[in-house]
C-alpha cells in the first residue's frame, strides 16, 4: 500500500536536506580535527627533539648585522612633500 500523503517530490527533498546536513557536519568535523591536531598544547613525538640532518649556521652577534643604507634619505621624497 502506498501512502497517499507522500507525493513524489517529498522524498527527494528529504534526501537533499539530509545530504546537505551531512556535508556541513562532516566539513566542520574535519576542520575541528585539523585545528586540534595542528594547535595541540602537547608536543607530539615527532616535534619533541630537533635533530638537523645538516649542521646549522653559527649564531651571529647583534653587532655584526649592519642595517642597509638608504638610497633616498627621509624627507627627500617629492611625493611626500606635496600636501
Curated annotation (Swiss-Prot):
GO cellular component, as recorded: apoplast
A GO BP entry: cell-cell signaling involved in cell fate commitment
Species lineage: Eukaryota, Viridiplantae, Streptophyta, Embryophyta, Tracheophyta
Chain coiled-coil ranges: none
Cystine connections: none
UniProt keyword terms in alphabetical order: Developmental protein, Differentiation, Secreted, Signal
Signal peptide start-end: 1-29
Keyword Secreted: yes
Protein name: CLAVATA3/ESR (CLE)-related protein 20
Amino acid at each position: 500500500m502506498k501512502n497517499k500523503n507522500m507525493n513524489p517530490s517529498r522524498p527527494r527533498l528529504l534526501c537533499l536536506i539530509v545530504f546537505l546536513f551531512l556535508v556541513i557536519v562532516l566539513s566542520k568535523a574535519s576542520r575541528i580535527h585539523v585545528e586540534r591536531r595542528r594547535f595541540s598544547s602537547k608536543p607530539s613525538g615527532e616535534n619533541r627533539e630537533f635533530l638537523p640532518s645538516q649542521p646549522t649556521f653559527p649564531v651571529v652577534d647583534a653587532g655584526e648585522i649592519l642595517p642597509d643604507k638608504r638610497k633616498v634619505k627621509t624627507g627627500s621624497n617629492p611625493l611626500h612633500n606635496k600636501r
